[in-house]
Swiss-Prot record:
GO cellular component: small ribosomal subunit
One Gene Ontology term from the biological process aspect of the record: translation
PROSITE patterns: RIBOSOMAL_S7
The protein's assembly and partners: Part of the 30S ribosomal subunit. Contacts proteins S9 and S11.
Keyword RNA-binding attributed: yes
Family the entry assigns: Belongs to the universal ribosomal protein uS7 family.
Name of the protein described by the UniProt record: Small ribosomal subunit protein uS7
Function: One of the primary rRNA binding proteins, it binds directly to 16S rRNA where it nucleates assembly of the head domain of the 30S subunit. Is located at the subunit interface close to the decoding center, probably blocks exit of the E-site tRNA.
Amino acid sequence: MSRRHAAEKREITPDAKFHDYVVAKFMNCLMLDGKKSAAEAIVYGALDKIQAKTGQDPLKVFHEALDNVKPALEVRSRRVGGATYQVPVEVRSDRRQALAIRWLIDYSRKRSETTMIDRLSGELLDAANNRGAAVKKREDTHRMAEANKAFSHYRW
């Protein structure tokens, strides 16, 4: 990692259908091997499926799912005098969003439905209703931070 200057953030363009930056970021994270059109088809297909199932605005459900998965605290390893402590720290807002997106994608890929559209829509619906593997991951992260609260004075 270079110590000269931090890498500058790239501007991302909002997605074509919803004109939403977060949906565009989600697509970029879902994309494999530069196949953006495939990622778009999966995300839009999943959001259409959510609308068909619930009758609600799919963008609202998507943002609700993302908010339910965003972690507030996480633990970072800190070495103090030969011992390594798991120190709970607050998560920055940009990292919070990145972790939520990553967890939603990872756990939707691990689901058992046949198509990625079904898996992603299922995980988004579960997350919007505060259940599912991605929400469990957030709860586990918070539980780890709570268990190591005694070491919070080692914060940096």
